[in-house]
Structure formats: structure tokens, C-alpha cells
């Protein structure tokens, strides 16, 4: 079976699907039209599927023979972002544009979904080569993490336990035609915060009679910056940023309140994420008290897991994909400090998250993710399709045993580890029956 040749043959279909999804982007938790179209495409291939309410779509391909009894999960995300797309990318006019004002696929999820549909098409047409089971996993709301809980609850209820998971992200930080297959940390974990400082407002001429939340925030911000040097091990990366700041309306009035929000990114949850989280609360509340202020937490995203490739699975992927596509395709980029809900899949089941380069200056596809100039190099889709199919088929036939490295607890235990309250966990399981 010449997988790369099959990927080339299916590439026009993948491009067509990508352009459809790009022209009709939908925000997180609103991907109804997208999910409907994915279902239509799967049905047209003769693949049965189930729509997971608030989660996405799960389909199962049973091979002609059970082989070694293994299961591989292939995943794609499908939501867009609230970004106003430009008519041109970095080099000139785009091949397709969003038809939805203020919404665009600015992170490549349109390509991810299209590539998984292409892989599904090949696998369905060659079930005699599938010696085991393959799960197709189309996830809603990756950008805000709103789809993965319901998808995992569904997997739990159905007793679906893959031996390995595969995901891929189109990546502007890597040149087109290269596929990053790293051992260990590939994308970062995130701790998110949205906090309001409550002070005492007053006239701008008498700051001595006010407790300015702005002064309080300045001290908090400086402490956040210093944390990287004084509170966290210097041998692990940490980035901290504040992207939202709201306070006051005019220059001569000290406001009562100030709201700030941001994120911290890291690779090691235990050595960096949890220590930073604990320091954050102590520091914010301590400084607020010193400035005569109080704080309220509008939202807190507890430290998640990093995307971390299982070394044995990653080495296997490099070997088999190198054999299929050529070793010159394999690359070792620096880990990416962005975050991904795929980390939860990897925490349960060892696997690989590949970074597929799309940076092509001639085509103008090098803009950063979540940027209005972001665009995809469609020529690389065949590599992504071939990579997914190759990993799946060769893993089913191979000797990689991940049983000792799988999550030892339940899916509910995983949610608990992430700081999710029991009643919220229950809501995930209820949601999939709505």
C-alpha cells in the first residue's frame, strides 16, 4: 500500500474540504454547521458516526481483521477564532476567504479537519489493510477547552480505550514540508487568570484619599514578572503575560475597580505550574491587602497538562513516517509555548502530536497563529494525511506496547486532577445525553 501516493490522490478532496471550512468558520461551541458537514462527509464514505453533544463527532473504523487487537485514535479540532480576516496573506491574495464577518480560521483547524477526513477516506477504502480498530475524533471548541470534557466522558461511557493517540497541528513556526516529531514536551501547559481588584476610587487630585486598584495592579504585575527569576526553578521555562486590562473611564478619576487577565505557560505542571499557581494566589491577595484592596476571581483555569509525546511512540513515528515520506521530512523544532487540549488525550493514552510546517514565504503563509494574516500552505496537506495513515496502520501491525504507560485511574480521576469540581464532572456526563 503506497500511502503517500494515496494521499496525493485524495489531496484535491482535502483542499476542497479545507476551503469549505475556511469560508464557513464557526466559533468555539458554535460549530453546528461544521459538525453537520463532517457527518455528511463521513456518511458519504460509508462511515457510521455519533455526534457527541457539546463535544464533536466520534466514528469507529473496524478493520477486516482484528490483528493484534490494538486501537489507534486520530484526532482533529474544528473551531475558529473571533478575528477579522484580511483579504490578503503576507504575499498577496488568499486562495479562499472567510465569508463570516469577524470570524476566521486563524489557527489551522480547518486544515486539521480536512486532513482527518482525507485520512478517513483512505482508511475506509482500504479496510483490508486495517488490522485493528481506528477511532476518528473530531473535537469542538479546542480554543476554549469546551469540547474535550464531553468527548472524554463519551469515550469513558463507551469503554473506548485506544492504545495510542495521534494528532497534528499545522505550524507557522516551521518551514513547509517539514514535520516536527519531538520526544517529550511539544506544546505548553497553561494557567489562566481573570481577576478584579476592588479598591477605593476618588478624585485624581487626592490619591492619598483613595486606594487605587491601578497602583495595586502595578505591584502585582511587577511580582508576576519577578516570579520567573525568584520563585520558579531556572531549569524549566515559564512565560507570563497579561493581555487584558480594564480600569476607569477618564483621566482625572481614580477608579474603584480594575480587571486584568492573562496566562502563564510552562511544560512541567508539577515543577512549575502548580508552584506558580500557589504563588499567584498568595501574592495577589497579599499585595491587595497591603494596598487596602480586595480581589475577586472572575475565572481561573487550573494548570493543565502539557502536550508531551511518548518517547517510544515518537521514535516509532519518526521511523515509519521517515520510511514512507523520506527522512528529510522529519524535523526537530523548538517546543511551542502555545497550549492544546490534546494534552488530555495524551495524559490518558500515550501518543504523538506532530507539528506540520506551513511557513512558505512565496505563498505568504508564515504569519503567526491567531493573526489576521494567518494562512495555510495547502501543498503540505498530503504529508499530514500520509503521516496519520502511516502511523495508524504501522502501529496496529507493530510491536509498540503502551499498556504500562497509560493513565492508571479513571477519566473522572483525570478531571479531578485538573481541579474540576465533582458537580462539574457530573455535568460533562449529563451533557452527552442532551
Residue ranges and their predicted role:
Residues 73-75, 84, 193, 353-358:
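Non-cysteine beta-strand/loop elements that form the S-adenosyl-L-methionine
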